Amino acid sequence: MISLIEQLKTRFIQALKTAFDQDFSDLEGLVVPATNPKFGDYQSNVALSLAKPLKQPPRTIAEQIIKALDISDLCEPPQIAGAGFINLTLKANFLENLLAKIQKDSRLGVEKASPSARVIVDFSSPNIAKEMHVGHLRSTILGDCIARVLEFRGHDVLRLNHVGDWGTQFGMLIAYLREVYPEALTTADALNLGDLVAFYKKAKVRFDEDETFKETARKEVVKLQAGAKDTRHAWQLLCDQSRREFQVIYNILDVNLTERGESFYNPLLPEIVGQLDEEGLLTEDQGAKCVFLEGFTNKEGNPLPLIVQKSDEGYNYATTDLAALKYRIKEDKAERIIYVTDAGQANHFAQVFQVAKKAGIIPENIEVVHVAFGVVKGEDGKKLKTRSGDTIKLKDLIDEAVAYARRDLEKRLAEDDRKESKDFINHVSQVVGISAIKYADLSQNRISDYVFSYDKMLALQGNTAPYMLYAYARIQSISREGNIDFEKLDEKAKVILSEETELALGKYLLQFTEVIEDVEINLLPNRLCEYLYELSKKFNKFYENCPVLKSEDPIKTSRLILCDLTARTLKLGLSLLGIAVVERM
């Protein structure tokens, strides 16, 4: 189903062509959702936008548009308000027919994009020999949600995990382990990731304080880069150990990724520097090869270059990112590349993208975008850390959320004198705890920082995962109470929107397509969260005002269809956020 707003835009473009013999299809905000229900369902301020180019009063333009506008099958007669706003109210019978139609559609009216595109979403990207921490939470959850929405829309999505599996830290760690625990460099699973992290910290101290050790570590890096068998084997073991523990987190979060670390692009780095040189973009500055760009300066106001080869002839993140871009466009055939990292890397990616465009790595028809996000803060307003000041491990964060959800569930069961099985308690606690973490993150505008609070994210009221899950479970309880199978509702039954709350719910259900398309374009998952929250509230109002099981047919079946559509929309919407539902809470 083409979204309602797109259908209206198409009719307006046709009307403008008829009225003024011009193509205004590129006009922004041709039709938008009404700001207030008293103005109808949708509005157009196109008459005001065209007043200057057409040299006519807005109301006169609005009158001409309405005269040429053919929407009698969709809307009540359009109304002109104020200076020339055109207000549109959808017809109840049009809405009723559309709801009956999407009730039979497993995709709830959301069509696949045409044409579809090859899209790469680069997200999560932890570092080898370091545990995943709260800083990886947003990238992992946001990236997964964006990938899910794009996949649902029919795009060919490659989810890439650009892990930090190369660099000086490996020389440092391997050199240290050769001294204190050589077995770890030859035997799989000799260490767990926690041990690796502890050894890494000790190695870093030695590296910073001991010049002899620093030189030994550098030699290990050279051996690694040269492909020395023993060093390469040790590196592989360290990577494998980290990889296994990362996968535990990904399994818990139900996140799928294809790993392609920094090391994958190593053979391509000299070629990148050579290409930049051929394009005349390189400048040597204090022995380093750099690209100076317009609009980038340091704190002193001096030009800030992008270094692509250090004075010791080593490469860096920028070189690797340029090589990755080239590979993704040339070999992966990506048409859209999305990087999901914190806002602190915005400057880096802006520079990399500009250099890549100058060098011809990014053609004009390829979209590259940095999906930036803010930091997770504690309730003290500072970056979320442990009491000792350490970064919180992601696994600990998840475990605590699940434990919190369990305590809350057991408390409610005791208050209601309800008996449930151990399996039920375990399952619901796990789903609610993980869902709460995901939803708390995704419901915020990603650009903003947000405060992490177990109390708020696990509350049964407000814009939270438990509220959404409860709304879904409540609808399932209607089917159980009435012994009704939603899948066996009469396919020929009509939807009847006679009550105000029925009409409001029906209209809102039909906006799902618009929201999914919005997230697909603007990559802001919080808009899907806002929609689902508003849908839950509209359903609650409907349920309070419109008896379902106590009604008589055809009203009863119509209201059951609205219940079913709401539950399915919640379930589908939450699944696109990476959140599972529960039938009972």
From Swiss-Prot:
Enzyme Commission number(s) of this protein: 6.1.1.19
Pfam families tied to this protein: Arg_tRNA_synt_N, DALR_1, tRNA-synt_1d
Domain of life of the organism encoding this protein: Bacteria
GO CC annotation, single: cytoplasm
Top-level class of the enzyme under EC nomenclature: ligase
GO biological process: arginyl-tRNA aminoacylation
Record key words, sorted: Aminoacyl-tRNA synthetase, ATP-binding, Cytoplasm, Ligase, Nucleotide-binding, Protein biosynthesis
HAMAP family recorded: Arg_tRNA_synth
Recorded family membership: Belongs to the class-I aminoacyl-tRNA synthetase family.
Name of the protein in question: Arginine--tRNA ligase
Organism per entry: Gloeothece citriformis (strain PCC 7424)
Top-level taxonomy: Bacteria, Bacillati, Cyanobacteriota, Cyanophyceae, Oscillatoriophycideae
Gene from which the chain derives: argS
